[in-house]
């Protein structure tokens, strides 16, 4: 006998159903974790449905090429469907895969990544790097809203701008979860209502910090009261005033995190990887693949505060890091100094434009790049001109990685290894590492 269940639905801010309830056989999954079904030859995307399921759904957005539908009932569930570990999953927009078993999440991501890189790799070539699926996130940006005169702290909802008030987040580290609950209780006093834009919570080796981004100035009295709260809760508090790029430090200056035997300093607004365990594994894998030696001069593009640069410098003859953010370059130089490196140089440069620097005129044997989502297409010709024997590309956007890698292959490189890195379990996000070798 077929089982029938009724999933909890999301916010009413979504488009309302416009068609009758219909039965669908789901045979695929999109990168956004929507089930793919076909009815009378037309594709329908159903949020919350999984491959292999028979469901009832109601179209709420009709298009010329495809429809989108609301899941009403699950008639026959997938064997891989699991109960979400978070009570807010059906409302909160933070996670998209909690209803799918962890091993199948990886399988779905691998299928999607192979599709993106179909012109570059075969199915057998894709490796996987993963760690614990919950309690991993050491950084979170929390949204603020006012409802019925009270401040609401949470995340944006699924496919909506509504702020969902949450009581727990299973992907946050335990220390961030505890700080979140303390902060939520403190905000009930409403003394920051209308002036607090959002909050960033962050955990590192030094402890927990909170960055408050203000929409207008506050009094010294109010600021002191919050600093007292932070001190009691052992939270380092930072303020960012309106239209000021650099954080105004309330209690402490720079933060730091440990990476193996190395200690890296950074400012609280600087980019660092949110998954500490996966960052460690990623760096170890990068060292293994690139295999730096005392014969290597390595160029580290989009280097940040030196997350790859310093580990590379342990083994290489020299490492040159390039980063557009001046504050991160300053932090990277400080990291080289305090960790005792004299073979590290850092350059502040915009890699979307030609870079003229004496450091680039020496023989560079290998290149590592970790660009933003837009990729590094503008700088590829410069890399090709440098002529490194190997290029290690770390990507947070598989589509731009595919574009850039196909260009490099056309210019004389070949793909040696590719790894899916599950940096964000319970979400559809995919990180990728690719090693390319110059053809002889």
Curated annotation (Swiss-Prot):
UniProt similarity note: Belongs to the class I-like SAM-binding methyltransferase superfamily. RNA M5U methyltransferase family. RlmD subfamily.
Keywords of this entry: 4Fe-4S, Iron, Iron-sulfur, Metal-binding, Methyltransferase, rRNA processing, S-adenosyl-L-methionine, Transferase
Record InterPro entries: 23S_rRNA_MeTrfase_RlmD, MeTrfase_TrmA_AS, MeTrfase_TrmA_CS, NA-bd_OB-fold, SAM-dependent_MTases_sf, TRAM_dom, U5_MeTrfase_fam
Protein name in UniProt: 23S rRNA (uracil(1939)-C(5))-methyltransferase RlmD
Positions bound to [4Fe-4S] cluster: 86, 92, 95, 169
Alphabetical list of HAMAP family matching this protein: 23SrRNA_methyltr_RlmD
Biological source species: Marinomonas sp. (strain MWYL1)
Enzymatic class: transferase
